[in-house]
């Protein structure tokens, strides 16, 4: 079976399968414009908006809980505990809002990538698609596992713990606790019916936040992987071109095609920035605070809380690293085009060819990148800055809390 699969060309939709399927579980259909069933599309949209209305009501409850907790130093620990969850929720909200606001850009981006996708197995081997897909799958699997592990442990640990204590350890009462610290305008634990309705309501809200947070980044990973594959193919074509001196017309036609191809890839990068720039800005600002507050919880809590928050900490750090890694990979792949052009046997070609090649090299010196507003292009240097900033906040918070 594996051999048969390896001998089959991969479609673009197969590469997009994970984010598309996960998005549909919360009602977001990226390819709704291709749907032939308007009723199904309408139901998806109703489910999506109803879910986000419910989710944002829960976020308001978290914000009220946070505000009430910071009024007294005795409850400041509770405020610190809920703060990273609020940050995660706001980033998920903003990412989904960016997807909705930039839906036309997203459709255009995905359609262009699908049109550029190599269709035959032979062509995909030329593009080294299997190598890019292998790395992409590993990243997607790791991040998906961590993100779902975080939302699952926070959502279901209190119920599992209470069930074990009540059913197996002989406790007289079932502890009606929730996985998230939320203020309610009523007593949400006064009886079993209300408690379980609210419990599953919160669990759905947590799942929706996790999927909105996860899928926006998975979509970014798939898109950047595809763009890097195209930049890499351009580099290989440039390096392998023979540049025969007696084939000037063919050389110029080849270079014109490469320049157009390169320009198309750069435009795709601009679409990515239009779609992601503001959400990534909020993501990095929140990530510093999230990692700080989570680290504080890990150093100041019980073993069971430490385990839960360690999963959250790993999720936050891996998410930031993943975005920075792909930002760095995009920069490297686009810069490689200029190096490949210079490594050609261009000295055998005509002056017109060399002039065009020079323009291509000059353009490639400004690398394609992911650029949040006011931030430098995202790279692994950005990751180090985020971690450094988080540690500074953590040290300040720890010192302030200890002194009081």
From Swiss-Prot:
The lineage's top-level taxon is Eukaryota
Cytoplasmic topological domain residue ranges: 1-45, 101-139, 226-277, 327-373
Q: Which UniProt keywords apply?
A: Cell membrane, Membrane, Olfaction, Receptor, Sensory transduction, Transducer, Transmembrane, Transmembrane helix
The residue ranges crossing the membrane are 46-66, 80-100, 140-160, 205-225, 278-298, 305-326, 374-394
Main localization is membrane
Q: GO: which molecular function terms?
A: ionotropic olfactory receptor activity; odorant binding
State the signal peptide span.
none
Q: Where in the cell is it found?
A: Cell membrane
Q: How does it sit in the membrane?
A: Multi-pass membrane protein
Segments on the Extracellular face: 67-79, 161-204, 299-304, 395-404
Pfam families, per the entry:
7tm_6 (PF02949)
One cellular-component annotation, GO: dendrite membrane
Respond yes or no to whether keyword Transmembrane helix is given for this record: yes
Q: Which InterPro entries does this entry report, sorted A to Z?
A: 7tm6_olfct_rcpt
Q: Does the keyword Chloroplast apply?
A: no
Segments forming a coiled coil: none
The job of this chain, per UniProt, is described as: Odorant receptor which mediates acceptance or avoidance behavior, depending on its substrates. The odorant receptor repertoire encodes a large collection of odor stimuli that vary widely in identity, intensity, and duration. May form a complex with Orco to form odorant-sensing units, providing sensitive and prolonged odorant signaling and calcium permeability.
**What is known about its subunit structure?**
Interacts with Orco. Complexes exist early in the endomembrane system in olfactory sensory neurons (OSNs), coupling these complexes to the conserved ciliary trafficking pathway.
The record's similarity note reads:
Belongs to the insect chemoreceptor superfamily. Heteromeric odorant receptor channel (TC 1.A.69) family. Or49a subfamily.
Additional information: The atypical heteromeric and topological design of the odorant receptors appears to be an insect-specific solution for odor recognition, making the OR/Orco complex an attractive target for the development of highly selective insect repellents to disrupt olfactory-mediated host-seeking behaviors of insect disease vectors. Odor-evoked OR currents are independent of known G-protein-coupled second messenger pathways.
Which protein is depicted? Odorant receptor 67c
